[in-house]
């Protein structure tokens, strides 16, 4: 019992001098643990008389409590210092220049769609839209596509039900426009379309812009002039254009439109398959059967129509060789535009 006071003072001195929590815990174990020096004083109580034990035990417990209180206070002080040091190290310098947020850009297909629309609306075309799920009449019958036509086959068309499909073109919007408006009509119909196809140059979903002009005395010369002027405006160059006879059930006569290869200048390369030309769009004069289905007098009015594959134009404009890249959401690819 003689050294209890000395042990207590020694413990308090060590507590006051320690600078870290690990050292503080070591002091606690050394003095107050099961084998600690102050705790060991309790073993000496057996050598005292019964009258002396209560007073001696009380002194030992008081010493333990005193040391424990100092340890708790020192621990709180060290933890506060640690928090203050951490806050100081992590403080924000408000005078530093801020980081600019990353700003997104328009998708190349969206850019191309907007460019096409701007070219046509600048010369008086309206923009019309329609549903992407179409009935048989608007997607096929009204466009002179009979029941035996191969375009109706399951391997070409996504059927929602026996009488409804995901539209295979935006031509149904033209049908709805002719049924709801009186000529003259001058409209483009942009939108998503769907076909059962997927490879380097085809995807199950893609975008089209179809155009329609219905008025008196509209001729194939008007169609050629419209297409030629559009392509020159889109590519911002005097690109050579050629028309080839073709077949579409909803136009007569019909034509495929080619432009001189933008990669080789007509010399022949891998992109144009050594022909020097690239197929770019289809067009023709509206078939009288289509006018009949839409309630337009084919004796009084004629019409021109054309269809543009938006991704096809985007590939040529931006030099993209795989159509599927447009739909993979690859930021490294999209950030180039």
From Swiss-Prot:
| Superkingdom of origin | Bacteria
Q: What are the record's GO terms for cellular component?
A: cytoplasm
**EC number(s) on record?**
6.1.1.20
Q: What is its main location?
A: cytoplasm
Q: Which family does it belong to?
A: Belongs to the class-II aminoacyl-tRNA synthetase family. Phe-tRNA synthetase alpha subunit type 1 subfamily.
Q: Which PANTHER family match?
A: PHENYLALANINE--TRNA LIGASE, MITOCHONDRIAL, PHENYLALANYL-TRNA SYNTHETASE
Name of the protein in question: Phenylalanine--tRNA ligase alpha subunit
Q: Which organism is it from?
A: Saccharophagus degradans (strain 2-40 / ATCC 43961 / DSM 17024)
Taxonomy of origin reads:
Bacteria, Pseudomonadati, Pseudomonadota, Gammaproteobacteria, Cellvibrionales
Q: Report the gene name.
A: pheS
């Amino acid at each position: 019992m003689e050294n209890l006071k000395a042990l207590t003072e020694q413990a308090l001195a060590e507590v006051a001098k320690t600078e870290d929590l690990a050292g503080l815990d070591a002091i606690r174990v050394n003095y107050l643990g099961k084998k600690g020096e102050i705790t060991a004083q309790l073993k000496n109580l057996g050598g005292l008389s019964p009258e002396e034990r209560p007073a001696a035990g009380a002194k030992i417990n008081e010493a333990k409590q005193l040391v424990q209180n100092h340890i708790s206070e020192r621990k709180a002080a060290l933890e506060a210092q640690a928090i203050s040091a951490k806050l100081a190290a992590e403080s924000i310098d408000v005078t530093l220049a801020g980081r600019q947020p990353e700003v997104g850009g328009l998708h190349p297909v969206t850019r191309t769609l907007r460019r096409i629309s701007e070219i046509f609306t600048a010369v008086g075309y309206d923009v019309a839209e329609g549903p992407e799920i179409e009935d048989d009449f608007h997607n096929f019958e009204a466009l002179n596509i009979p029941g035996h036509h191969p375009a109706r086959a399951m391997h070409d068309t996504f059927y929602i039900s026996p009488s409804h499909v995901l539209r295979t073109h935006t031509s149904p919007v033209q049908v709805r426009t002719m049924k709801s408006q009186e000529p003259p009509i001058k409209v483009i119909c942009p939108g998503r379309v769907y076909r059962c196809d997927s490879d380097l140059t085809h995807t199950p979903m893609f975008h089209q812009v179809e155009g329609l002009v219905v008025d008196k005395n509209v001729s194939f010369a008007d169609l050629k002039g419209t297409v030629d002027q559009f392509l020159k405006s889109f590519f911002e160059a005097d690109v050579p254009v050629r028309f080839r006879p073709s077949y579409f059930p909803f136009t007569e006569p019909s034509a495929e439109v080619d432009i001189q290869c933008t990669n080789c200048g007509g010399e022949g390369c891998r992109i144009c398959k050594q022909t020097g030309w690239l197929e770019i769009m289809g067009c023709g004069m509206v078939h009288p059967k289509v006018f009949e289905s839409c309630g337009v007098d084919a004796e009084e009015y004629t019409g021109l129509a054309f269809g543009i594959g938006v991704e096809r134009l985007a590939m040529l404009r931006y030099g993209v060789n795989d159509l599927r890249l447009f739909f993979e959401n690859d930021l490294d690819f999209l950030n180039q535009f």
